[in-house]
Design a protein with these regions (language model features):
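Short intrinsically disordered terminal tails
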Residues: 1, 74-75
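Short alpha-helical segments that sit at the start of domains
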Residues: 1-15
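Alpha-helical hairpin
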Residues: 7-8, 35, 62
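Short capping segments at the starts of secondary-structure elements
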Residues: 20-25
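A short acidic, leucine-rich amphipathic alpha-helix
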Residues: 28-32
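Short amphipathic alpha-helical interaction segments
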Residues: 34-48
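A short, conserved structural fragment
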Residues: 48-58
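Basic, amphipathic "hinge/linker" alpha-helix immediately C-terminal to the N-terminal HTH DNA-binding motif
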Residues: 59-73
Length: 75
């Protein structure tokens, strides 16, 4: 997955930025940014399938690839 995929959609960008800032709860990110929870979870699944995110217990955590993308996007 590349940064263009994340940046091409405003909801993906918001959720990715929330996860990159250390938040581990998708529902909390969705509520904060007024995103429909179902949409937020669908985006999280896209990130998991793309290898950027992993789910540990009930928390979502960026993978090493996700951390590299975060650094690249924030430049």
């Amino acid at each position: 997955m590349d940064e263009g995929f994340i940046l091409s959609n405003k909801y993906r960008r918001v959720i990715f930025d929330g996860l990159a800032s250390g938040e581990t709860n998708i529902d909390r990110i969705a509520k904060k940014h007024r995103i429909i929870p179902h949409v937020a979870h669908k985006i999280a699944e896209e990130f998991i399938n793309g290898g950027v995110l992993e789910k540990k217990e009930n928390k979502y955590v960026l993978t090493e690839e996700g951390k590299k993308l975060s650094a690249k996007i924030s430049e």
